């Protein structure tokens, strides 16, 4: 079955058609590392991780490049505020970002280039644009792209030049010929990082950075480019223009990239979460409160193109759902131990993959899994001894769920280990000490062995009053935070 995506360039859902059959060259815009990653960044890279995982599961050879913007106005400002070297500041936040992405279960990209390591390639690309007449050097040492020289400008963002001109302005100190033009190279200023160039010392503009790194690590044209909806204009619009002008046909967006995908924002009270608005939560702080896999499940519960509302209550619900998944798997694993799965798989896995083929519809996959978990629990909880066929069906369920979980990045831990971790996070949020709960469970077990059921019930009720529910099963007593 073909994979269909919502392509921002055409404004339609259409089949993903790689330039070279069976291979996908994919570039996702990475973070500007001037601060800790926030919850919105986590959503972005879980989305692209899902895209890469599913494409590979469907047999595509994917080369995934995601950059670090470590040369930028925001980095310079933050370093100045903190009296810190901007290179060191960016390197520290890049390391922290990688740690956060690892915690979320994201695969590392094949290449994670940094702007600071690609300045010669950037200078070469700008030189090519100047030579071809798409860019010009100003007297002050800046270099600008001439927007009107590229006929397909604004197609991605569905904006024409007249609309853009009405909102354009020339900032003080800029030497552009046309308010629509944008900087490819910025002349050196005191206290800023500087590199040599044919136009004098300076540093790259934001947009040219991604174009040069795409060319360096994927070549042009590429098959797929991704980012948040806030990048459609101006960043991706400008990327298309300068890339197609420098190494494409100079006329069409497709000569740089064939397909474009953009995800929705994480919102708080219907407003985009962002550092500039000051309404953000760092990913690191959220991962300290909630199980990382639960946070991943939270992201996957909303289609990537739609906005997703953030709150602690919604995250806690995602964590409870994950707890249910692992409780079911723990129960099923015990019942199906030593049993070969029935059949060769299919149903659940193929239904899930078909949902992902349709514009990476993760919420539909979770709906498929919800039905499978309901059926598995009904079978596992059925009274009476399990038949060999029952155990084989349960084994098949566990196999299939874990198989599709490799694409979602979910349910890959041992259930007992996952449940301990989830309980510990939930308990910590309520000020409950897991060790004291475990001690009470031991005390209750001793009371039950002594047939002191009044004491046993009192312990259970006291824990429940604290928000801890006990569950007795064949494997012993477990607990969860209500």
From Swiss-Prot:
Coiled-coil residue windows: none
Cofactor comment text: Binds 1 zinc ion per subunit.
Superkingdom of source: Bacteria
Chain ranges for the short sequence motif 'HIGH' region as given in the UniProt record: 31-41
Catalysed conversion reaction: tRNA(Cys) + L-cysteine + ATP = L-cysteinyl-tRNA(Cys) + AMP + diphosphate
Main location: cytoplasm
GO CC annotations, alphabetized: cytosol
Essential cofactor(s): Zn(2+)
Enzyme kind, highest EC tier: ligase
Binding site for ATP: 275
UniProt xrefs under Pfam families: DALR_2, tRNA-synt_1e
InterPro entries per record: Cys-tRNA-ligase, Cys-tRNA-synt_Ia_DALR, Cys-tRNA/MSH_ligase, Rossmann-like_a/b/a_fold, tRNA-synt_1_cat_dom, tRNAsynth_Ia_anticodon-bd
EC number assigned by the record: 6.1.1.16
GO MF: ATP binding; cysteine-tRNA ligase activity; zinc ion binding
Subunit structure of this chain's protein: Monomer.
UniProt xrefs under NCBIfam families: cysS (TIGR00435)
Similarity field: Belongs to the class-I aminoacyl-tRNA synthetase family.
The protein's name in its UniProt record: Cysteine--tRNA ligase
């Amino acid at each position: 079955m073909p994979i269909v995506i919502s392509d921002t360039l055409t404004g339609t859902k259409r089949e993903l058609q790689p330039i070279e059959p069976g291979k996908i060259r994919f570039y996702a815009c990475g973070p500007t590392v001037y601060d800790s990653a926030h919850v919105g960044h986590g959503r972005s890279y879980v989305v692209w991780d899902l895209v890469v995982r599913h494409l590979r599961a469907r047999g595509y050879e994917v080369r995934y490049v995601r950059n670090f913007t470590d040369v930028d106005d925001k980095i310079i400002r933050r370093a100045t505020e903190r009296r810190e070297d901007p290179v060191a500041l960016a390197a520290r936040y890049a390391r922290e970002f990688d740690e956060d992405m690892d915690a979320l279960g994201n695969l590392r990209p094949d290449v994670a280039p940094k702007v600071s390591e690609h300045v010669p390639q950037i200078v070469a690309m700008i030189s090519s644009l100047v030579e071809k007449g798409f860019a010009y050097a100003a007297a002050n040492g800046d270099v600008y792209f001439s927007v009107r020289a590229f006929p397909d400008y604004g197609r991605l963002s569905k904006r024409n030049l007249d609309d853009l001109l009405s909102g354009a302005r020339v900032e003080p100190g800029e030497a552009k010929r046309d308010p629509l033009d944008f900087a490819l190279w910025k002349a050196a200023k005191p206290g800023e990082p500087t590199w040599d160039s044919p136009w004098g010392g300076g540093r790259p503009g934001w947009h040219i950075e991604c174009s040069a790194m795409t060319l360096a690590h994927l070549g042009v044209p590429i098959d797929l480019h991704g980012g948040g909806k806030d990048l459609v204009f101006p960043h991706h619009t400008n990327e298309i223009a300068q890339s197609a002008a420098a190494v494409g046909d100079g006329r069409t967006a497709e000569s740089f990239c064939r397909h474009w995908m953009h995800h929705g924002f994480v919102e708080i009270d219907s407003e985009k979460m962002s550092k500039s608005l000051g309404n953000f939560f760092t990913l690191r702080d959220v991962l300290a409160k909630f199980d990382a896999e639960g946070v991943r499940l939270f992201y996957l519960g909303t289609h990537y193109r739609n906005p997703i509302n953030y709150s602690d209550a919604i995250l806690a619900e995602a964590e409870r759902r994950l707890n249910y998944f692992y409780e079911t798997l723990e129960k099923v694993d015990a019942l199906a131990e030593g049993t070969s799965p029935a059949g060769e798989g299919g149903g659940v896995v193929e239904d899930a993959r078909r949902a992902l083929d349709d514009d990476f519809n993760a919420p539909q996959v979770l709906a498929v899994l919800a039905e499978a978990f309901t059926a598995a629990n009904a079978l596992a909880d059925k009274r009476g001894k399990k038949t060999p066929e029952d155990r084989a069906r349960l084994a098949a369920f566990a196999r299939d769920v874990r198989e599709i979980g490799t694409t979602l990045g979910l349910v890959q831990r041992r259930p007992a280990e996952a449940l301990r971790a989830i309980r510990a996070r939930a308990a910590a949020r309520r000020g409950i000490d897991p060790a004291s709960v475990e001690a009470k469970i031991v005390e209750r077990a001793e009371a039950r062995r002594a047939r002191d059921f009044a004491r046993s019930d009192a312990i259970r009720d006291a824990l429940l009053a604290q928000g801890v529910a006990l569950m007795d099963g064949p494997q012993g007593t477990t607990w969860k935070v209500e």
